[in-house]
Amino acid sequence: MSTRPLWYRWARVGFYGGAIIATGVVLFKYTTPTDEQLIASFSPEVRAEYEKSRELRQKEQQALMEIVKKTSASNDPIWKTGSIKSPFEKDGRYVDPKLVDPQALLRESAAEQQRIETEEANRKMEETERLLNEKRKKWWSWK
C-alpha cells in the first residue's frame, strides 16, 4: 500500500486526467480544418459539384426551418413530424425525403438567369437605340 495521502493520489489523477483532456482539446482545435480549408482541399470536380449544390442545400435548410417553426407552434406531440413523412411509419416508407425538388430549383434558377440576361439585353438595346437617335439628330434640327 502507498504511504502517500489520499488527497495526493486524487490530485495526481485530476492533474493527469486534465492534461489528457487538455491535450485532446488542443489537438482537436489545431488539427481540424475550417470549412474554407476543407473546401479548398477538394478536387476541382468535387468543389464544382459542392458549389453547384449549395443553393439546393440552402433551400432545403430553409424549408426544414419553416416546417420546424410550424411544428413547434402546433400543440401536437413532438414525435409528429408535420409534413415530413417518418420512415418508421407505414405511410412514410418509400417516400423521397427531399424537401426541395432539385429539378424545380434548377428550372427556377435557369428562368431567373434567363430573365436577368433578357433585361440586360433590353437595356443594351435601349442604350443603342438612344445613341443612334442622338447620332441621327442634326445640329440644326428640332427633333
Swiss-Prot record:
The keyword Transmembrane helix applies. The keyword Mitochondrion applies. The chain crosses the membrane at residues 13-32. It is found in: Mitochondrion inner membrane. Residues 114-131 have a biased composition (Basic and acidic residues). One of its GO terms (biological process) is mitochondrial respiratory chain complex III assembly. InterPro entries: Cbp4. Its main location: mitochondrion. GO terms for cellular component: mitochondrial inner membrane. It is a single-pass membrane protein. It holds the Pfam family CBP4. Residues 103-139 form a coiled coil. It comes from the Eukaryota. Keywords: Chaperone, Coiled coil, Membrane, Mitochondrion, Mitochondrion inner membrane, Transmembrane, Transmembrane helix. Residues 110-131 are annotated as: Disordered. Belongs to the CBP4 family. Essential for the assembly of ubiquinol-cytochrome c reductase. It has a direct effect on the correct occurrence of the Rieske protein, core 4, core 5 and apocytochrome b. This is Assembly factor CBP4. The lineage of its organism: Eukaryota, Fungi, Dikarya, Ascomycota, Saccharomycotina. The gene is CBP4.
